[in-house]
Amino acid sequence: MQEKMTIMQVLPALHSGGVERGTLEIARALVAAGHRSIVVSNGGQLVEQLKHEGSEHITLPVHRKSLSSLFQIRPFRRLLAEIRPDIVHARSRIPAWITVMSLRCMSPAMRPHLITTVHGMYSVSPYSAVMTRGEVVIAVSETVRSYILQNYPRCDPARIQVIHRGVAPEEFPFLHQPSADWLERWQQTYPQLAGKQVLCLPGRITRLKGHETFFALVAELKAKGLPVHGLIVGGVEEKKRPYLAELEGRIRALRLDADITFTGLRSDIREVFTQCQLVLSLSTQPETFGRTVLEALNLGVAVVGWDQGGVGEILAACHPQGAVAMGDTVALAQTAHAALVTRRRGDPVTCFRLDDMCRETLEVYARVIGGR
């Protein structure tokens, strides 16, 4: 029987986001397997959920991207000496620096193992290089692994392990249908979608998401006689309001006022996806993973996206007919048109499962501890 492990995950805060979601998923898996799960962060809206699911939370200001964070080295080192975790799993750069500096001042007998996860393709710098300092460096996709090898040659390839993010099929079940109440509210809120083939572009309102390409696609499909409507699902930060106004101006210029809808941030993305005939991924830069693409495919919704980054990896494995060479807008329109005309849904997804992600991560923990 495996001995009980004490694992401490460290990240800036517990607000919404992919890093935070992954932290909670691993914490939940640790508790379910009978291990002690501790998370250190500056707090946030997900703390109560974390604690309710059986983990411990310790509040420490490990979030500030400034020299003031160095003042957290001593209290964090005291915390490590008191708890004596087997592993510290750093999930972001400032927490990783605080951890590395704390471990330097500890005796080898007291020092926990360090694991890092590279969640994104950070700006290449000595500051970011700290994420390659783990005994094991977890990359969330092959794309991230390539980024590490290309930009940080001092990182031994043998220390890098790819563990793809995953989706729980019970959370995004194949051919899921929303409740009658939800459908009634949806139809009342968005009557303009009735009788339309809905194209969805999920993601926050930023210049990287490919909105202008999306508008052009909607215009072209409409010109070909398809009854399409574009749905942009994602929140907008206050500082991005000028960009939103720019997008709205572009919509007017293309005479798509009645053909594009912004929903804002939605907490019911599963239900929203079921009302879409096609989900698009058109980011101008490679995504590190592409979770929304995987969620849509799990539901059986067809996806079309640029064949790059983590999205390209997912499409290659689960829905290759939806992959389009980056920037080829002619092929994009042809692929989207074919998907809408044939009305072919995606096939059940059998890879990129949450259970696999959790199992592989816990196996890394056990292997690192066992190699002592």
Regions found by a protein language model. Give the residues of each.
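Short hydrophobic beta-strand element within catalytic cores of glycosyltransferases
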Residues: 39, 302-305
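A conserved mid-protein helix/loop that constitutes part of the nucleotide-sugar donor-binding site
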Residues: 17-28, 197, 201-220, 242
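Conserved acidic donor-binding segment of nucleotide-sugar-dependent glycosyltransferases
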Residues: 317-330, 337-341
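Short His-centered aromatic/hydrophobic patch
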Residues: 90-96, 118
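Acidic donor-binding loop of glycosyltransferase active sites
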Residues: 274-288, 301
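Active-site donor-binding acidic/aromatic loop of nucleotide-activated sugar
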Residues: 239-244, 257-266, 272, 323
